[in-house]
Regions:
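Cysteine-cluster motifs in flexible loop/terminal segments that predominantly coordinate metals
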Residues: 154-197
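Extended non-catalytic scaffold regions that mediate assembly and binding
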Residues: 1, 98-106, 129, 133-146, ...
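Generic hydrophobic segment detector
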Residues: 52-59, 95-97, 181, 192-202
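Histidine (H) residue identity feature
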Residues: 15, 83, 150, 195, ...
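Long, charged N-terminal interaction/targeting segments
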Residues: 2-138
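Polar/charged alpha-helical tracts
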Residues: 5-8, 69-72, 121-124, 147-154, ...
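Short Fe-S-cluster ligation motifs
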Residues: 143-145, 202-206
């Protein structure tokens, strides 16, 4: 999509932009599919605005003892955002900085494109994955604490990178004290157990 065909850009120019995905096996946190919007919808936006897209996924417990299957499940979840192509909604994603900028066409705005419709497209794609039970998609189009959102995105990226590295195969006799992932493992419950093959399913009490 050429710039002259765009009505505006979400996260364009000097505006903030961030996206990240959280995963939980606690069904109470994502009891149903949902699309939430904080800020103006697409038909109300008149120029470039800040933008965030946050996804919270409810997933089945992944059997980490089957490391190849667990690794594939995590990677498949990450790739969903590259398979959503709403008409007139062009995504530019920078994995290194967790930025996601969107160019929205004038034609799409006239046709009634909305965040609800785009969110439903994301949900449809995510739920093709049999490990995913429910999806909450959150869009933000106004000024909020983007510094905190970027910090959260960085933390999630570090955890995902650590999990991927563990599942790809780390020596079980590795000295944790000398490992670059130690700060992440110290903070996130279960990563050390995952590394040493002792992951146990947590019991959920009502």
């Amino acid at each position: 999509m050429l710039l002259r065909d765009a009505a505006y850009e979400l996260g364009g120019g000097a505006n903030e932009a961030v996206n990240f995905t959280c995963v939980t096996s606690d069904a109470a946190l994502v009891p149903s599919d949902e699309v939430l919007l904080y800020g103006p919808d697409m038909k109300e936006i008149k120029g470039d605005v800040p933008f965030a897209r946050i996804v919270i996924l409810g997933v089945k417990d992944i059997d980490v003892e089957k490391k190849d299957a667990a690794y594939a499940a995590i990677r498949n979840i990450e790739f969903v955002k590259y398979h959503v192509f709403p008409d007139g909604y062009m995504m530019r994603v920078s994995p290194e900085s967790s930025r996601e900028q969107i160019r929205v066409s004038k034609k799409a705005v006239k046709k009634g494109i909305s965040f609800y419709k785009v969110g439903c497209d994301f949900i449809k794609q995510y739920k093709k994955n049999p490990n995913i039970t429910n999806v909450r998609v959150i869009f933000v189009t106004k000024d909020v604490d983007f510094k905190a959102l970027h910090a959260t995105a960085k933390k999630i990226e570090d955890v995902t990178k650590t999990m991927n590295t563990i599942l790809e195969g780390m020596p079980e006799d590795l000295d944790c004290a000398s490992c670059s992932f130690k700060p992440v493992c110290d903070e996130v419950e279960g990563l050390k157990e995952l590394h040493f093959g002792k992951a146990a399913k947590k019991e959920h009490h009502a």
